[in-house]
Amino acid sequence: MVLAASVVQEVANVPFAHEVAGLVQPVAEAQNVLGLIPMSHGLILAGILFAIGLCGVMVRRNFLFMLMSLEIMMNAAALAFVVAGSRWVDPDGQIMFIFILTLAAAEAAIGLAILLRFYHQRGHLDVDSANEMKG
């Protein structure tokens, strides 16, 4: 009976703040690790990658290079989601990355199938000739 009373006394002496600090400490450590790269730098990198991909889509006329530029643009958007999610220690950014990665894989598969069909019909990958009709 004395042992049970001493255990109850020790539990009563532990302040609630120590329990909260034990739960908050891993979150603070995660913020320190993820905070090595500022959010602005990550978003600037994502913006630069998106601009490179956009220039590639607008300038290049080869269908394969246009698909690669589109992939760069999708990866830039995924990077922006991951950076934003890591800023607030929220897994939503990583979940969106998985969705974008899945979408990019489907886009690549369909795009390459269209590319092969286009190449077998035309013999080249110039998209400017796609509006010319056979006749």
Curated annotation (Swiss-Prot):
Compartments where found: Cell inner membrane
Keyword entries, A-Z: Cell inner membrane, Cell membrane, Membrane, NAD, Quinone, Translocase, Transmembrane, Transmembrane helix, Transport, Ubiquinone
Pfam families hit by this protein: Oxidored_q2 (PF00420)
Reaction(s) catalysed (UniProt annotation): a quinone + NADH + 5 H(+)(in) = a quinol + NAD(+) + 4 H(+)(out)
Keyword Manganese included in the entry's annotation: no
Membrane-crossing residue ranges in chain numbering: 33-53, 63-83, 95-115
EC nos: 7.1.1.-
GO cellular component, one term: plasma membrane
Entry membrane topology: Multi-pass membrane protein
Entry's Gene Ontology BP terms: ATP synthesis coupled electron transport
GO molecular function: NADH:ubiquinone reductase (non-electrogenic) activity; quinone binding
Predominant cellular place of this UniProt entry's protein: membrane
Origin: domain of life: Bacteria
Alphabetical list of Gene3D superfamilies matching this protein: 1.10.287.3510
Family according to the record: Belongs to the complex I subunit 4L family.
Known role: NDH-1 shuttles electrons from NADH, via FMN and iron-sulfur (Fe-S) centers, to quinones in the respiratory chain. The immediate electron acceptor for the enzyme in this species is believed to be ubiquinone. Couples the redox reaction to proton translocation (for every two electrons transferred, four hydrogen ions are translocated across the cytoplasmic membrane), and thus conserves the redox energy in a proton gradient.
PANTHER family cross-referenced by the UniProt entry: NADH-UBIQUINONE OXIDOREDUCTASE CHAIN 4L, NADH-UBIQUINONE OXIDOREDUCTASE SUBUNIT ND4L
Record NCBIfam families: PRK05715.1-1, PRK05715.1-2
Subunit structure as annotated in this protein's UniProt entry: NDH-1 is composed of 14 different subunits. Subunits NuoA, H, J, K, L, M, N constitute the membrane sector of the complex.
Name by which UniProt lists this protein: NADH-quinone oxidoreductase subunit K
